[in-house]
């Protein structure tokens, strides 16, 4: 049996019980206490651009329809019929004004309102037997959008999304706000790996240390302008709000010179200068750092890199990828990976950038193959009895007395928010695991049961207890998510 208190205490001092990367009890706790109340990325507005467009996304075992209703509002609806629980939408994406349950034919508008109930009067006695008026598919308890990125939380009392993101918004803008019209996404590609979901999130958050070993061959074949993987140590790791990542150190030059070095054409540079704040521009132009990989707690990551795309050419071209580490079990993860690009970029640029993404971080990408080999091995090894005796050292960057090996950069040295250091460390991985431990330490309040189609007062009377809320009632559904009466 897992001693959860001991696990949490060890993680809080930077020592990592190896078995947390393949432990069924830990995973059950994660499902309840972490994924049951965190903000989780599910889609981007560009995936549902028109009224009626939808995609279906999963949060662990829960399926949600992310739709744009007829008024243009984004909805996140639990994909479960109010009658007998059948999924009302079985396609991954499409366009529909209504969703019809294939079991008994109940139908719902794309804003969630029930509009069709066969034999309502004959079978239920009309409204007296089943109150159809005002009933909706269950909306996600909390929904928030930032730069077109759609997040949901299963916690109705979740803090506002932008408060949760905090200063990490500063860095998210580099990936998602390169022009006034934002980005568009292609994908997602999906694949499964026999690895624990936390490993990928940690790797993208701040592990520059693995690059010279794991990815040496990719760098030394000449895919990048930087001739040696060891150059990663000249970049920084930063942590801000609930996310963190890494940067590359760029050669000397002006803002424009440095953005051209990364491969951005002048018209895109012009749009960046219009959209990014002076502080964001200074990180690149004055300080000489460009964002690379990053992770937002708990399971969302970003990648920004600039390989050579065309054979025989010295020119590089940047790509951006967004991905989600979707847990399947304690030892399996579904990776969802999107290609992201400035909506206003030329079609030629989009095509070459997509090629760069597939080459490096698509399902068959060179970096992906290197990384997955490590992650699968770690997960397998963590399952054994010997792993339960081992506390892995996650304290890189700290002396034994807790003092920093390298102090954070000052405001004169670095223009961005958060805590930023040059060189190898595990500060960011610790920050992720500290938040992980904090969630696992705090119990989740049980959610109220929802009664479908009957008066809450009557439900309480029948049950002989307090009245329970009904689906669509103000007690359980945020006002912003409630549908109008049919």
Regions found by a protein language model. Name each.
Residues 35-39, 86, 209:
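Generic structural signal for secondary-structure transition and capping sites
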Residues 43-50, 131-133, 363, 377-380:
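Short linear motifs in intrinsically disordered
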Residues 47-170, 482-485:
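Rieske [2Fe-2S] iron-sulfur-binding domain
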Residues 9, 16, 20-60, 64:
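Non-catalytic accessory segments flanking enzyme active sites
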Residues 37-49, 122-127, 295-308:
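Short Pro/Gly-enriched beta-strand edge/turn motifs at strand-loop
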Residues 1-12:
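N-terminal flexible segment immediately upstream of the FAD-binding catalytic core
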Residues 67, 73, 141-486:
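C-terminal catalytic domain of Rieske-type non-heme iron oxygenases
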């Amino acid at each position: 049996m897992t001693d959860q208190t001991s696990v949490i205490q060890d993680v809080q001092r930077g020592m990592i019980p190896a078995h947390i990367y393949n432990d069924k009890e830990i995973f059950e706790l994660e499902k309840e206490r972490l994924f049951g109340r965190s903000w989780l990325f599910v889609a981007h507005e560009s995936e549902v651009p028109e009224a009626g467009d939808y995609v279906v996304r999963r949060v662990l075992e829960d399926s949600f329809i992310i739709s744009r209703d007829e008024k243009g509002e984004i909805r996140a609806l639990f994909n479960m019929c109010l009658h007998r629980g059948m999924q009302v939408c079985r396609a991954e994406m499409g366009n529909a004004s209504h969703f019809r349950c294939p079991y008994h034919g109940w139908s719902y508008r794309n804003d969630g309102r029930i509009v069709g109930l066969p034999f309502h009067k004959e079978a239920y006695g009309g409204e007296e037997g089943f109150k159809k008026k005002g009933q909706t598919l269950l909306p996600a308890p909390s929904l928030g959008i930032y730069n077109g990125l759609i997040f949901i939380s299963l916690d109705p009392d979740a803090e506002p999304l932008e408060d949760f993101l905090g200063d990490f918004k500063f860095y998210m803008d580099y990936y998602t706000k390169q022009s006034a019209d934002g980005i568009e996404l292609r994908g997602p590609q999906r694949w499964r790996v026999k690895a624990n979901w936390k490993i990928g999130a940690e790797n993208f958050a701040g592990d520059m240390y693995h690059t010279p070993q794991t990815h040496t061959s990719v760098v030394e074949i000449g895919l990048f302008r930087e001739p040696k993987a060891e150059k990663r140590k000249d970049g920084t790791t930063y942590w801000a709000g609930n996310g963190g990542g890494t940067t590359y150190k760029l050669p000397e030059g002006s803002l424009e010179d440095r953005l051209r070095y990364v491969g951005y054409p002048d018209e895109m540079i012009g749009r960046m200068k219009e959209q990014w704040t002076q502080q964001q521009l200074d990180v690149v132009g004055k300080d000489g750092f460009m964002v690379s990989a990053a992770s937002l707690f708990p399971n969302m990551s970003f990648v920004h890199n600039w390989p050579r795309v065309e054979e025989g050419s010295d020119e590089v071209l940047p790509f951006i990828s967004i991905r989600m580490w979707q847990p399947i079990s304690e030892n399996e993860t579904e990776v969802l990976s999107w290609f992201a690009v400035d909506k206003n970029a030329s079609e030629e640029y989009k095509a070459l950038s997509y090629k760069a993404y597939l080459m490096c971080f698509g399902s068959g990408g060179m970096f992906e193959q290197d990384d997955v080999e490590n992650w699968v091995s770690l997960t397998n090894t963590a399952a054994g009895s010997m792993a339960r005796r081992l506390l892995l050292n996650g304290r890189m960057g700290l002396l034994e007395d807790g003092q920093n090996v390298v102090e954070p950069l000052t405001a004169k040295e670095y223009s961005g928010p958060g805590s930023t250091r040059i060189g190898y460390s595990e500060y960011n991985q610790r920050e992720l695991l500290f938040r992980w431990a904090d969630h696992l330490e705090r119990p989740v309040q049980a959610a109220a049961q929802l009664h479908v189609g009957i008066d809450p007062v009557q439900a309480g009377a029948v049950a002989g207890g307090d009245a329970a809320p009904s689906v669509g009632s103000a007690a359980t559904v945020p006002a912003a998510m409630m549908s109008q009466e049919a």
